[in-house]
Each structure stands twice: as structure tokens, then as C-alpha cells.
Amino acid sequence: MTRETTAAAAESTIRSLEDQRYAAVIAGDVDGFLALAHPDLVYTHSNAEVDTLDSYVDKLRSGHYVYHHIDHPVSRVLIAGHTAVVVGEMHADLTAGGVRKKLANRALAVWVRDRDRWLLLAYQPTVIPGDDR
């Protein structure tokens, strides 16, 4: 395989994993999300709150976060060695702490290759200002 072929295959895999992780949280499939997440996950929210894997999963299990719908267009996937950076957006309809919300964020997700599989290591959304939505 050429370097370009390998990078294209990795990009395709990462795009699929992004679809799977969003589908898991929409479905309330915590085990499905856990299968995709690195144990050292840093999950930052658009309100600047930061969760670890354990605290985020606890919030999913308790119903603190209930995702009703998510669109997540991907602009770019950058592959550098065993790291993939996903640049895109996340538009969501969710309930957080009992309050229904709509989110419009630019988003950055970091995946790392660990023992022949890709795992989500970090997620960072940034609110898109109202005029730019």
C-alpha cells in the first residue's frame, strides 16, 4: 500500500467511527460509546465543562445528557502517524440536566491508534456565533 492509500483508508475509518460514536450517544448505547473511547478521554463541552471518560459515561447513563438528534458534518480529517484530527461541526438537539437545548458548534475530535484500533482521545466544541450558523 502506498502512503496515500493508507491515509485514505485511515480517513475512511475515522469518518465511520465518528458516525458510530454519534449514533451510540443518540441511541443511548453507552457500551457502544465506551468501545470507541480511550480510557484517558478528555471530553470538553461548549460551556467549558470538562468530563473524563468516567464522568461523561456516568452522565449518559443517568440521563443527564439525552441526545435527540445530531448532525456532524466533517470538513477535514488529518492523519499524522497514530493520530487523527477531525475538523467539523456538531449541531445537536439534546436535553442536558433536564433542559432542552440546541447546539451549533465547530468541533475538533482527536483519535489515536492504540493496539490496532482507533480510539477517541479528546473532543472540543466551540460555539458558532449566531451570525455564522
Indicate residue ranges for each PLM-predicted region:
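A beta-strand edge to alpha-helix "cap/lid" segment located at domain peripheries
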Residues: M1-A35, D40-R133
